[in-house]
Amino acid sequence: MELLIPLSLLGLYLFSGTRDSVHKGEVKDDLKEKPIKVNFNLTDSTKVDHKTHLKQYSSLKPGDTLEIL
């Protein structure tokens, strides 16, 4: 015998605790939107091997920091 549960109901069951805490205004610090800073290091070998893929990053220098929003 198979038990088929619609994914929407399963999702409501699995995430009901998270959803309730958010509705009460209890959002944890790690859930708030924050920019993630990534250190983008380019080595000389990367520039040579992947020149075509890095055209959009040609203005970056080794050690530059990208901000992903």
From Swiss-Prot:
It is found in: Secreted. Keywords: Glycoprotein, Secreted, Signal. Glycans are attached at N41. GO terms for cellular component: extracellular region. Residues 1-21 form the signal peptide. This is Putative uncharacterized protein DDB_G0277463.
